[in-house]
Amino acid sequence: MNSCIVSIGLSNPGSPIPQAEIARFMQLAHQLDGQERRKLDFLYRKSGIDFRHSVLDDFQKEEVAEFTFFPKNKKLSPFPSTSARMNVFEAEAAGLAEQAVRNALQQADIEAFSLTHLVLVSCTGMVAPGVELELMRRLGIPSSVQRYCIHFMGCYAAFTGLRLADQLVKANPESRVLVVSVELCTLHFQKEYNEDNLLANSLFGDGAAAALVMQSEKGLQIKNYLSEVLWEGEKDMAWKIGDFGFEMRLSQYIPSLLNQGIRKLRNLFEEKFNFSQVQHFAIHPGGKQILIQVQEAFGLSPDVNRHALEVLRTCGNMSSASILFVLERMLQDPSIQGDILALG
C-alpha cells in the first residue's frame, strides 16, 4: 500500500460575507471618493469571488460605531498593531483548526489518540505554545505525538506539509500523520491605498483544512512531487512582518509571470509526471487570473478549474488552506478518476 490522503476536513469562521459588503468596508476604510469607489467596485465585481469568511465581524458592519476590532472612527486610528492581531490569532486559530480536524477524523473513522504525527501549517500567525499544542489538548492527541510547524512559506506550504507526511509514512508505514493548515488572512488588512493592498484586500479570506495521511487502499495516493523556484517573480510577491500586521507585496504581473514560468517547466513536468496523460488538475485558487493563466499555459479546458473556481467563489484565497479545499472537492467527486496534478 502507498501513503494516501484518506480524508480532508474543512472549516470557515462565521457566516459567508458577500464580496459587496467587504467592498463597502474597504471604501470606508480607504476613504475613497466617487471615482476611486467605482474602481474598487469594478475590481471586486471582477474578482471571481462572491463570498469570503473572516474571524473579524467588522468587515460586515455598516457603521464604524459597530466595529469591535478596528477603532471606531473613519481613519481607523490608532491602527491595530501586529501584537493586537496576533492576540486574535491566538484566540481564534485553534478553534477553527479543531473543527477541520474533527471533520477529517470523523470521515476516516480514526480516533485522535491514534495519531503519530501532527504537522501545523500557517503563514498568518505564530504563537508559542502553539496551535498544535492546543489541538492536542482539545482533541486528546497523545503528548508523545511528533510535532512539526511549517510557518511563513505562503500559499504553497500545504504541499510542503503533504510531502513531509508522505515521507514520514514511507519511513514508518504505521504512521498516521495529520496535516493542519489554518490561515487567518483577514487579520492583516492594510489601510494604505496602493496596488499591493488593493489586490490583497480584494482576495483573501480565512479558513482551515486538515488532511489525514496514512497507508491505505482508498483516498488520494501521493505518487510524486516537484519543487522549482521561478526567480523572475522574486520582486513581485513578498510577505513581511510589519508594525501593523503582516504586509504583502502582490504585483498585478504575477499571473503573466506564472504563465511564462510554467511554459518553461512543461518538459520537466512531462518527464516527472507524464504530464500529457494527466486529465485532472488541482490548481491553487490564488485569484481568477492566476487560474486562467495556468490553464492557458498548459492548454487545458476551462472545466479542469471548476473546483478551484468554486473554492475561490465561495471562500476567496485562503493561502495554504486553499489547495486542500480544492482537493477535498475532488476527493468527493465520483467523476474524477485517474491522476491529479496539484499545483501551487
Residue ranges and their predicted role:
Residues S7-G9, V121, H151, R176-E183, ...:
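Short beta-strand segments
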Residues P80-S81, F113-H117, L139-H151, K191-D196, ...:
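Glycine/charged-rich beta-loop-alpha catalytic/anionic-binding loops adjacent to active sites
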Residues A100-L115, R263-Q279, F298, M330-P334:
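Phosphate/pyrophosphate-binding loops at sites that engage ATP/ADP/AMP, CoA/4′-phosphopantetheine
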Residues M1-V88, R176, C185, F189-Q260, ...:
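Condensing-enzyme catalytic core mediating Claisen C-C bond formation in acyl metabolism
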Residues E98, C123-T124, P142-S144, C149-K170, ...:
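Claisen-condensing/thiolase-fold acyl-transfer catalytic domains that form or cleave C-C bonds
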Residues M126-I141, V179-Q190, K235-W239, L291-N305:
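Acidic-glycine-rich active-site phosphate/pyrophosphate-binding loop
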Residues S77-V119, C123-G125:
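Hydrophobic alpha-helical hairpins/lids featuring a short glycine-rich hinge
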Residues M1-N2, A112-T116, S143-Q146, A171-V177, ...:
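Short coil/turn connectors at secondary-structure junctions
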